[in-house]
Swiss-Prot record:
Keywords assigned by UniProt, alphabetized: Antiviral defense, Endonuclease, Hydrolase, Nuclease
Origin superkingdom: Bacteria
Entries under InterPro entries matching the protein: HNH78-like (IPR013467), Retron_Ec78_HNH_endo (IPR053575)
Species in which this protein is naturally found: Escherichia coli
Protein's recorded name: Retron Ec78 putative HNH endonuclease
Amino acid sequence: MKELARLESPEILDQYTAGQNDWMEIDQSAVWPKLTEMQGEFCAYCECRLNRRHIEHFRPRGKFPALTFIWSNLFGSCGDSKKSGGWSRCGIYKDNGAGAYNADDLIKPDEENPDDYLLFLTTGEVVPAIGLTGRALKKAQETIRVFNLNGDIKLLGSRRTAVQAIMPNVEYLYSLLEEFEEDDWNEMLRDELEKIESDEFKTALKHAWTSNQEFA
């Protein structure tokens, strides 16, 4: 999960009113360009590539019908709720498998920086960031649980594979720490971070680079 900058609302949302219109009436293809502009071709929650996708209501429309067409409540999530076979993570899992939760206890990536709450390990797992207590710790724990960010075996394996693929380069760069001036070494690190800007599981890769010394 990465921090997102929400842009202006798609105009089509202004044509629909909660209580008068149903979500399935809207042409969702007119909403997707703005979602893609905000989050790229990746899931807003797990950062996998959106090969299967749906528009997710952060606060579910069944419980919060007034938010059905509210732009700030919409994200692009992996999984296609129209296809059989279920989906064991992110938006579909949140509202069909996670059990009871309070949306206020979840990280909302367009309002908060997930880096303040979550740390991805080189094993592919994600854990609460070091030093969290109280409400911040609960948010991290509930976000991991409700979106099932560690419990989906396919997701965990894909994330681990992506991280392990860069670890030789990570380890090599860190082996050069004593050979370069700090500014020069940091510039090399920035170059590596730029290379992953458009990669799947970008945050996990970024944490492998930036937190390597503690969690390799």
